[in-house]
Amino acid sequence: MSRRKQAKPQHINWEEGQGEQPQQLPSPDLAEALAAEEPGAPVNSPGNCDEASEDSIPVKRPRREDTHICNKCCAEFFSLSEFMEHKKSCTKTPPVLIMNDSEGPVPSEDFSRAALSHQLGSPSNKDSLQENGSSSGDLKKLGTDSILYLKTEATQPSTPQDISYLPKGKVANTNVTLQALRGTKVAVNQRGAEAPMAPMPAAQGIPWVLEQILCLQQQQLQQIQLTEQIRVQVNMWAAHALHSGVAGADTLKALSSHVSQQVSVSQQVSAAVALLSQKASNPALSLDALKQAKLPHASVPSAASPLSSGLTSFTLKPDGTRVLPNFVSRLPSALLPQTPGSVLLQSPFSAVTLDQSKKGKGKPQNLSASASVLDVKAKDEVVLGKHKCRYCPKVFGTDSSLQIHLRSHTGERPYVCPICGHRFTTKGNLKVHLQRHPEVKANPQLLAEFQDKGAVSAASHYALPVPVPADESSLSVDAEPVPVTGTPSLGLPQKLTSGPNSRDLMGGSLPNDMQPGPSPESEAGLPLLGVGMIHNPPKAGGFQGTGAPESGSETLKLQQLVENIDKATTDPNECLICHRVLSCQSSLKMHYRTHTGERPFQCKICGRAFSTKGNLKTHLGVHRTNTTVKTQHSCPICQKKFTNAVMLQQHIRMHMGGQIPNTPLPESPCDFTAPEPVAVSENGSASGVCQDDAAEGMEAEEVCSQDVPSGPSTVSLPVPSAHLASPSLGFSVLASLDTQGKGALPALALQRQSSRENSSLEGGDTGPANDSSLLVGDQECQSRSPDATETMCYQAVSPANSQAGSVKSRSPEGHKAEGVESCRVDTEGRTSLPPTFIRAQPTFVKVEVPGTFVGPPSMPSGMPPLLASQPQPRRQAKQHCCTRCGKNFSSASALQIHERTHTGEKPFVCNICGRAFTTKGNLKVHYMTHGANNNSARRGRKLAIENPMAALSAEGKRAPEVFSKELLSPAVSVDPASWNQYTSVLNGGLAMKTNEISVIQSGGIPTLPVSLGASSVVSNGTISKLDGSQTGVSMPMSGNGEKLAVPDGMAKHQFPHFLEENKIAVS
């Protein structure tokens, strides 16, 4: 930066001892010499003005003619008149020109010279002048050639650089000395060489020094007030804490000692200020005296800022202003604001203290600014410290976010996918994961189910529960806690909540005298938790403020879990893998299944496995088609209840026909509950099947009716086979099976087997008439003819039922309503349920059994079981969904018709041309192409009589064998197994279309009374024909298919009006 020339520059005159020379007007030569000199040119001669001018003539060539320099004040003048006027009024004191561009306070001229005198008189500068002795010999030490420019800093004279030393040693052989100072632009002083070096003492600078010291003392007092504020706050915390540890006491002692040190520093500052005030009154005060009056800093501890070693090191911003941040950083971590209750500067007068600091001059504002920043940070800690992690510097906005973060320290993942077993830390992650499973995509109901289960399972994952016994359950929350001595502190809640919520609290280990013995399921040597009210004090240094985690909160539990993660387990209900503490041993056992993947509870319908029985119960509701219980209708004769009015009507007709005794059966004490189910395996042995407890909230028969084995070898039988001796009982059981679901075929087949067992065990001369009728019905159920579609596969074993003449049939009009609703299982070797059962409303049918009955007999070893090849029935949810293409249908019949498109099944065959159709409606339309009249009853009768062997077109070659060997021979004392060889014949179309009207008009076959020990005997040439809705009638036929004459003694049908009433179809 270029320096501008001063208007009136002055030369520094180093001669002070010379007296005043007589003023003489300069000669022309002198004027020329003075004019030849540049402004600010040095005066090389220490003599008078004449000598100087003479010596300077040969040195410099004159440039200007009108330059005049005063010998006293070294002022330069360019006009002679001005110079002469100045000579008259000139004094020895040289003027000082200070050019300052800053706005700070500028010290006076006297203080500037006094400061220069101090610097020159400092002992560190060996070549400086002594203040009291400014002789010519002293001047020679610096060199008479030297010209010193005193540059004062433009900023505030508060930093150590403001009063700095001049360069040491002699100045080089030059007449100009420049000193670069920071923060200055232009500041030049010129003094005469003969001017005295600070002839006046530096008493004028003492008030400024005292002012700075007072500012420093004010800062110290503010620090003392702040530390006192901290001490009061800590005392308030200590008053709230019930138990203060040793560390807390040490912290308080350290804080008190620090406050006392601050007080001592303040006292030292006050003493120093008083000493300086006394010495300031002495005008002959030197720098050495000031040095002797410096503050003693050797006794100041390192916690406080050490004072400077000299007066010049006193600044407006000493290290003492950083006492508060340093002090806060030196405090133990327990005293820092980790919780909202431990926030500094919270009292109302702290803000007043900081506001008072703003009244200082100059640099004291920095203290208020830094304290304000600290106050803002402290207020931020109030907001953020509430959810601050104690183990890492992360801060969260909500408590739930902090809980999720704490799981990263514990490694806990409480949310488990029930399908694949993957674990997650948050419920949202589990939800997203569940939506990716194809099982959940197919059935969205499972998502809500799994989420509910996940919420319940994750509710007590972090709890460290303490079991409360029954005798202490009456304790209130306000009861005095019992302190536990001799145990490590875990920072637990101060009071333990009794009652059911006690499992959510945490407990530590108890003394040995309070610990019961280890449980057999826990590890050896691991004591159980004691009982009773337990109180554990918080950790030393931890303060419970207004924002601290509540007792028993999840955040506190997670924090304790992090602290105790490396400790050995002492709880018998604690998981050794993830260290989670469960409420009881059963919960712990279920929890271990999440680690091992064990799922012992398996659904017998779909084969899915679950880890708990409750989950299995919830899952069974998916398979339950209808859960509501409809209004039941009671039979007026035997008081049996039915949900379907049509079934009740048929039941009453059975009473009137003599098939069911009119006397009501004795009530069984196990109404609405099924006996122990029986599972029949391939080897014929019967075994009990486990069923759920009644306390689990599910009816036993409701569960057992849905039990389907995972394989085809075992089938559950809800009612023992001996119970089926009564027709009403068997009817009720089958109705109950149907109301629970449409797939109870195995029980129906078991009923047939049990009926054959009874017939074979009750008498050796019994014929297979009843069994043949069952087999015929069984095979006709498997046939694909239109008649077999509506065949009722039901034949109870009873004396009344053995009467082959008690037959009831339905009209073709009844088939119209029933054909579409016939239920089949679309698998290999399919079977079907009777449509009457399918139309029955869901109910819990009361099973009525006699007072005494025999147990289920074992199956003969020589009889091949029919259940070995039975496929597992398909159970659908409430919506009827196709398992192959995924289409949904409103009813099971529509789904059944749709499934025929996949299998290619065409069960309805034309009796004239043999063409097959998938639906009965298509077959009916096809009949019209043969030219038959529209009267379906007439058409059916003509087809059945005129072309009785049309249905045997496919396998007609077996018809003579069937009629010759079996149908035309007496059916007495024939092994039931021998009837199985004709299964294929019956499937091929042996069941012919017999018109119901003709049967009713011709009359039925008379029933022959038989005893309980023998089965019924069917006359030669009779074949049991089962209709779609009732047990079929026996038509006497000859070997060539002609209809035989009915004897006169045979009774007619008991219900001639059955056709008209049966037209009512209830879906």
Curated annotation (Swiss-Prot):
Disordered, as annotated region: 1-62, 115-140, 471-521, 682-716, 752-835
GO molecular function per UniProt: DNA binding; transcription factor binding; zinc ion binding
PTM annotation (Phosphoserine): residues: S53, S308, S785, S798, S1029
Zinc finger map (C2H2-type): 68-90, 387-409, 415-437, 573-595, 601-623, 633-655, 880-902, 908-930
Coiled coil: none
Post-translational modification (record): Sumoylation with both SUMO1 and SUMO2 regulates the stability, subcellular localization, transcriptional activity, and may reduce interaction with POU5F1/OCT4.
Top-rank taxon, per record: Eukaryota
GO CC aspect terms: cytoplasm; heterochromatin; nucleoplasm; nucleus; protein-containing complex; transcription regulator complex
Self-association state and partner proteins as the record states: Interacts with POU5F1/OCT4. Interacts with NANOG. Interacts with BEND3. Interacts with NSD2 (via PHD-type zinc fingers 1, 2 and 3). Interacts with NRBP1.
UniProt protein name: Sal-like protein 4
Lineage start: Eukaryota, Metazoa, Chordata, Craniata, Vertebrata
